From Swiss-Prot:
Changing W180A: Greatly reduced the glucuronosidase activity. The record marks W180, W563 as: Participates in a stacking interactions with the sugar rings of 4-O-MeGlcA. GO terms for cellular component: cell outer membrane; extracellular region. This is Extracellular xylan exo-alpha-(1->2)-glucuronosidase. Its main location: membrane. Changing R345A: Loss of glucuronosidase activity. Belongs to the glycosyl hydrolase 67 family. It comes from Cellvibrio japonicus (strain Ueda107). Homodimer.
Length: 732
């Protein structure tokens, strides 16, 4: 390590101490919160086991790993730990690869490291030259970085280092976060401030927050970021913006994070260079090849494009009589000489189809096997749109000859924005562990994504995170936990929601068991609570249109039927639910036969999906013994009670949480309880008005009538223009 690098690391170390000394807890550090180990016995043990940091190599990534270890160990062990490459001392932490570290090379780890690939790593307590050491070894510098973060996580979560011996490698290749950031810094479906990217000061000024953003993602093994909205502005490909984006790419590169861009399919026309964007027109093909060359001249390791095409008004190849494969392959050809890929979103639904549920499958399945090998279909977990609970997208089980990756949503578009606590880990786990039967037993979504089922070339997972300039990045402190769970599951889809929650709580708040266990259980139930007070039993899309915040199950008068709530629930005097069996839209036929058979049968379909696939009588007998009307009411009331239980749990944690974050979560849970009651009352009263059935007397009765809640929907979030006749009643 050069003298300059050592000086740089020292400056990083001392600079990192200043914010901790000057600021109270505000959530900025996320899970990289390196506070001293509170258990004094354990602290002394760690202090004995790691006394020195030995670093070989001088790449930006090795320097980033060394800086993180200095920062983390000095904080956790409550004593300065400085990186050196001098003579090995007893009880050192040694990091490196066999190529850049003679000490690592001396351990002859060749076969063990070879099995871990380019990004995997090995952590082990061993001896070198009779000296006690802990090693972080990998085949590449980025593997060393990932291993360094893992070692810090072990100490943060108070795992023993005695006899440490573990290895880890990612199961998925592309582990990517998506931002829906516009160039004016407004974040679509973002609830935590403005966009992180300050275009006005780039490329000259790189805010320290950009490096912290890279650290946060690298700590999870995330290796790519798409920094702009899928509803893309063509100007993102201009020289003016490419200069700025290149500066961001430079900041992210030491942390193993590739830069990707969302592109507008009509960009050749928008730039005025050609009068068409037809993907089979040679002029258009050449335009994209030339533009790709320009991008790579700015960003040599550019990852590729994310494309939303022929969806919700965005242009695409269908506007020129071409299909998705022809559009994607044209872009893929432009990127292929540079090693770039195309993430092509499968989120499509046209207004002229009988059932929106069927849209993506019917459009993409005929194209299976026609996409280029550097095209990856980016498919949402369900067939509609990030609803609180959806069945899995049938595309995952069907597209056996096409690269596919998952798209999850971390930003809470349908879970109460930044005001509701709704840990998404259980949703991710539920999806990834779903058995599709695509190739018999073991064909889980996770295994399909990994390439184990269909042997695809590219694998991956994307998460729409949408952080912003709020000090804590995500608005609600617990939205951080969903970001964390996404990253951990993108690295290893077999990690459970409970494990991710446990780690996050320990790293973010406290290791005290009296805190961990109740709050972890609160987190694990929070997603189900959100389902229950919004859309239980397989109901879906009951939101106020546009903002997607509050309830509006009565919506029936929008330009497109599939934007209304009544389209989905189909409630009437006699029953409720969407018939997707053979006697209905037959969307169930898109699934493998074992799934179609089980979900088409009222005796075997899971009750939490039943109204997705069946239109049932209000008198249908449920597993609880209640009829469907009674069960629906019960679920709505159960959701509110679950939120109230979450409040009681959090109220008991004041001794374990700093005052600022405790007060913020407490206040937000009060908002959530109020909104859960509004959801419950709005939906129960509306469905009562349709079914003509009473709310059982043993339940808390709504304070207001249905018309009140209809009016309230217009003023709670993004109010409609002022109309005294329709708004005055709400304001009384």
């Amino acid at each position: 390590m050069s003298t300059f690098a050592r000086l740089f690391l020292c400056l990083v170390f001392f600079a990192s101490l200043q914010p901790a000394m000057a600021q109270t807890e505000d959530g900025y550090d996320m899970w990289l919160r390196y506070q001293p180990i509170a258990d004094q016995t354990l602290l002394k043990t760690y202090q004995k086991q790691i006394r020195h940091l030995h670093v070989a190599g001088d790449s930006p990534t090795i320097n980033a790993a060394a800086a993180e270890l200095q920062r983390g160990l000095s904080g956790l062990l409550n004593k300065p730990i400085v990186a050196r490459d001098e003579k090995l001392k007893d009880y050192s932490l040694v990091i490196g690869t066999p190529d850049n570290s003679p000490l690592i090379a001396s351990l002859n780890l060749g076969e063990r490291l070879q099995a871990l690939g380019a990004e995997g790593y090995l952590l082990e307590q061993t001896r070198i030259n009779k000296r006690h050491v802990v090693i972080v070894a990998a085949n590449s510098d980025v593997g060393v970085l990932y291993g360094s973060f893992h070692l810090l996580r072990l100490i943060q979560t108070q795992h023993a280092l005695e006899k440490l011996s573990l290895s880890s490698a990612p199961r998925l290749q592309h582990r990517v976060v998506n931002h829906w950031d516009n160039l004016n810094r407004v974040v679509e479906r973002g609830y935590a401030g403005l966009s992180l990217w300050d275009w006005g000061s780039l490329p000259n000024y790189l805010a320290p927050r950009y490096t912290d953003y890279a650290r946060i993602n690298a700590s999870l093994g995330i290796n790519g970021t798409v920094i702009n909205n899928v509803n893309a502005d063509p100007r993102v490909l201009s020289d003016q913006f490419l200069q700025k984006i290149a500066a961001l790419a430079d900041a992210f590169r030491p942390y193993g994070i590739k830069m990707y861009l969302s592109i507008n399919f009509n960009s050749p026309r928008a730039f005025g260079d050609v009068d068409t964007a037809d993907p089979l027109d040679p002029r258009v093909q050449q335009w994209w090849k030339t533009r790709a060359q320009k991008i790579y001249s700015y960003i040599p390791d550019f990852g590729g494009f994310l494309v939303k095409a022929d969806s919700e008004g965005q242009p695409g190849p269908q506007g020129y009589g071409r299909d998705h494969a022809e559009g994607a392959n044209m872009l893929a050809a432009a990127l292929k000489p540079f090693g770039g890929v195309v993430f092509w979103r499968a989120f499509v639904y046209h207004p002229d189809i009988e059932d929106r549920f069927r849209g993506a499958y019917d459009e993409f399945m005929p194209l299976d096997g026609k996409f280029a090998d550097n095209v990856i279909l980016q498919i949402k977990n369900g067939p509609i749109d990030f609803q609180p609970r959806e069945p899995f997208s049938a595309l995952f089980a069907g597209m056996s000859r096409t690269n596919m990756m998952m798209e999850f949503q971390i930003t809470q578009e349908y879970f109460g924005f930044a005001t509701h606590l709704a840990y998404q880990g259980p949703l991710f786990e539920e999806s990834l562990k779903t058995e599709t039967h695509a190739r018999g037993e073991g064909s889980t979504i996770g295994n399909i994504l990994e390439g184990k089922v269909f042997k695809t070339r590219h694998t991956g997972m994307a998460g729409v995170i949408n952080p912003g300039t709020d000090r804590n990045w995500t608005g609600h402190p617990f939205v951080q936990s969903s970001w964390y769970a996404f990253g951990r599951m993108a690295w290893d889809h077999q990690i459970s929601a409970a494990t991710a929650a446990d780690e996050w709580l320990r790293m973010t708040f406290s290791n005290q068991p009296a805190f961990i266990e109740p709050v972890k259980q609160m987190m694990l139930v929070s997603r189900e609570a959100g389902v229950n007070y919004r859309s239980p039993l397989g109901l879906t899309h009951l939101y106020s249109q546009g903002d997607h915040y509050g309830p509006a199950p009565w919506t029936d008068d929008l330009p497109r039927a599939d934007w209304t709530a009544v389209y989905y629930h189909r409630a009437s005097k006699t029953g409720i639910g969407f018939n997707r069996t053979k006697t209905g839209s037959n969307a169930l036929a898109q699934y493998p036969e074992p799934i179609a058979k089980a979900w088409g049968d009222l005796n075997s379909v899971p009750e939490d999906l039943i109204l997705w696939f069946h239109h049932l009588s209000w008198d249908h007998r449920m597993q609880s013994g209640r009829n469907l009307w009674q069960e629906l009411v019960h679920k709505y009331y159960q959701g509110v009670e679950q939120v109230r239980a979450m409040q009681r749990t959090w109220d008991q944690q004041e001794a374990y949480v700093d005052a600022a974050r405790f007060a913020q979560v407490k206040a937000l849970l009060q908002v959530q309880e109020r909104e859960a009651v509004r959801w419950r009352n709005s939906c129960v009263l509306y469905f009562q008005s349709v079914a003509g059935r009473p709310i059982p007397a043993n339940y808390e009765q709504p304070e207001h009538d249905l018309e009140y809640y209809k009016m309230l929907a217009r003023t709670t979030y993004v109010p409609e223009p002022w109309h005294p006749a329709s708004s005055s009643r709400v304001l009384k």
